[in-house]
Each structure stands twice: as structure tokens, then as C-alpha cells.
């Protein structure tokens, strides 16, 4: 399923990002969690990731999500946003006063599909800027969202190498058949500035 088949317009995207921000704010301020919007897509199961970046220097502050459609989208947004704000092991939990110095970005994912070509051909099967990728091997796993390759101007091979590192696997792990590589697409919405206008990316 391509990202174009996920029926999400900018209005829905803005609601999704707002839900993520409100969920994180509620958790950090010990308040009641926000209600999920009534729009049907929020009650369909989709994979979702919340990315929190500092503003204006755009440094990662937290990123956690669910690659598989385990949860209804609304619930997944709330959970991933709270985890990104409080439970990303790479960072200390956010403080409430940080909320006005960060932006929220939401990635709504298609169902991951295994890349079944011969391992050496995997780079050709990945479209940089469109595909996100997942590696799984022997209990270790890692995921990179599509926008990572764009942001760092990676080739498909560099993207796969970065994935191996993210998964804690060895360099060139993607060349081995026993390492499962899957790809997915995402529709991405994010704030231009804290509490600001939302754009599709």
C-alpha cells in the first residue's frame, strides 16, 4: 500500500499533530489526556511515529512509534507522543517548559512489506525519500523513517548502512539474507514552529 492510499488531508494531519502535542502536554503537566477526534481515520489501525525536534535549531528531542498497525491511529498518536516526550532512552524526559521550544511531527505509516530481492539488490528496491526501512535480526531491530534519508541526503546504500547502525548490527548487515529488511511509506505532517501552522512534508 502506497502512502497515497492512506486518506489523510492537511486538515486531518493538523488534527493529528495537535493531538500529539496535547497528549504530551497533558502527560508532562499531569492533566487529563485529550479526546481522540471523531474523524474515521483516527479509529482505523495504522502504524505511527511521533518526532519531537527542538526549535529553532531542529535537533532531535525524541522519536518513538509503532511500525505495525497495532493501535487505532488516535490511540497510537497519544501513546507515541507521550513515549517520545518521556521515554526515548537517548534523552532525558522533557520538562513542561520545553513544550514551547519544540515542534511535533507525525508520520502515519503504511504496513511494512518485506524486501524480497537478493540482498545485494536491496538498494535498488528502496526509493530514497519515499521509503522508510526496518531491519530485524536475531532479536535486534531498527527503523528509519523516509525523511531521514532526505534530511541527510543519503543514497540507498548509505540509508541501509545507517539502518544497520540504528539496529545495533554490524556494518553491511543488509547484505546478508538472514537480516530481514522491510520497507514502508509514510505521510508526514509537522509544525512549522511550536504551536504553529502544520504543513505536509
From Swiss-Prot:
SUPFAM superfamilies: AMMECR1-like. InterPro entries: AMMECR1 (IPR023473), AMMECR1_dom_sf (IPR036071), AMMECR1_domain (IPR002733), AMMECR1_N (IPR027485), AmmeMemoSam_A (IPR027623), Uncharacterised_MJ0810 (IPR023472). It comes from the Archaea. Pfam families: AMMECR1. Residues 11-200 form the AMMECR1 domain. NCBIfam families: AmmeMemoSam_A (TIGR04335), TIGR00296 family protein (TIGR00296). This is Protein TV1384. It comes from Thermoplasma volcanium (strain ATCC 51530 / DSM 4299 / JCM 9571 / NBRC 15438 / GSS1).
Amino acid at each position: 500500500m502506497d502512502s497515497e492510499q492512506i486518506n489523510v488531508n492537511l486538515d486531518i494531519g493538523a488534527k493529528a499533530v495537535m493531538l500529539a502535542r496535547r497528549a504530551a502536554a497533558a502527560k508532562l503537566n499531569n492533566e487529563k489526556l485529550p479526546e481522540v477526534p471523531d474523524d474515521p481515520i483516527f479509529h482505523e489501525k495504522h502504524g505511527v511515529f511521533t518526532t519531537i525536534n527542538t526549535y529553532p535549531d531542529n535537533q532531535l528531542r525524541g522519536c518513538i512509534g509503532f511500525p505495525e498497525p497495532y493501535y487505532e491511529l488516535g490511540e497510537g498518536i497519544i501513546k507515541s507522543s507521550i513515549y517520545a516526550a518521556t521515554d526515548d532512552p537517548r534523552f532525558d524526559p522533557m520538562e513542561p517548559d520545553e513544550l514551547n521550544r519544540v515542534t511535533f511531527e507525525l508520520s502515519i505509516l503504511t504496513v511494512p512489506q518485506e524486501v524480497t530481492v537478493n540482498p545485494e539488490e536491496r538498494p535498488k528496491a528502496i526509493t530514497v525519500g519515499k521509503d522508510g526501512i526496518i531491519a530485524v535480526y536475531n532479536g535486534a531491530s531498527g527503523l528509519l523513517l523516509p525523511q531521514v534519508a532526505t534530511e541527510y541526503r543519503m543514497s540507498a546504500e548509505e540509508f541501509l548502512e545507517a539502518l544497520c547502525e540504528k539496529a545495533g548490527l554490524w556494518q553491511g548487515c543488509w547484505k546478508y539474507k538472514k537480516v530481514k529488511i522491510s520497507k514502508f511509506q509514510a505521510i508526514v505532517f509537522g509544525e512549522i514552529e511550536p504551536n504553529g501552522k502544520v504543513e505536509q512534508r
